[in-house]
Amino acid sequence: MRNLIILFLIFIIPSKALGLIEVDITRGNLNPLPIAVSPLSIDDESKKSFEKTLKKKDIGSEISKVIEKNLKTSGLFNPLDKNAFLQAPDIAHLKPRFEDWNLIKAQALITGKVKNVDDKLRVEFRLWDVLAGKEMMALAFTTVPNNWRRVGHIITDKVYERLTGEKGYFDTRIIYVAEEGPKTKRIKKLAIMDQDGANNKFLTLGNEL
């Protein structure tokens, strides 16, 4: 996990000890778990800094979109419409009003915040059990700003594992052979991309295959 540091783990309590929510992936006809992915809050100074370096207007929202997309494509989770959220992201991260999240039928909630610390990207996130009104997990990461998508994948892995008991697969990369050029003179190149198709890069020039 080069250039990526897990700063701290506040706590992870086994769900069976508290009777918290779990996703049973062994059952057939599984109904996706309703989960609210709150946009990661960010202070104005950090927002301007990352907008300049990453060309992203709101990097906190971009990271939350990665998490939301990952959870949705897994088929096990149903990310809820953000327009229905009743609590501001920064307030929800500190102390969720669980009655508000219950009102929109969320069973789990992800909150977080982003900050520029010495030109590094620091991301904190928390996973909450809405039904039990308890925090299930809290983690923080510090990395170079360009790793923002990977942070989203790692957070999804942690959430997926916590709720299903299975290892996540979102922070993985795929190596494949890409072809281009006319049919009579195809060029094959070795390429790599994230599991969601982002960050596609060629590893060879086409002369090696």
Stretch-by-stretch model annotation:
Residues M1-L4:
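Positively charged n-region of N-terminal signal peptides that target proteins for export
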Residues I12-K16:
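N-terminal signal peptide c-region/cleavage motif recognized by signal peptidases
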Residues I21-E22, A92-K158:
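Amphipathic beta-strand/beta-sheet edge segments enriched in Tyr/Trp
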Residues D24-R97, I110-V114:
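Short beta-strand->alpha-helix linker/helix-N-cap micro-motif
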Residues T111, I174-E179:
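Residue position within the beta-strands of beta-propeller blades
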Residues W148, R162, N207-L209:
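Conserved beta-propeller blade repeats
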Residues M193-L209:
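Multi-bladed beta-propeller domains
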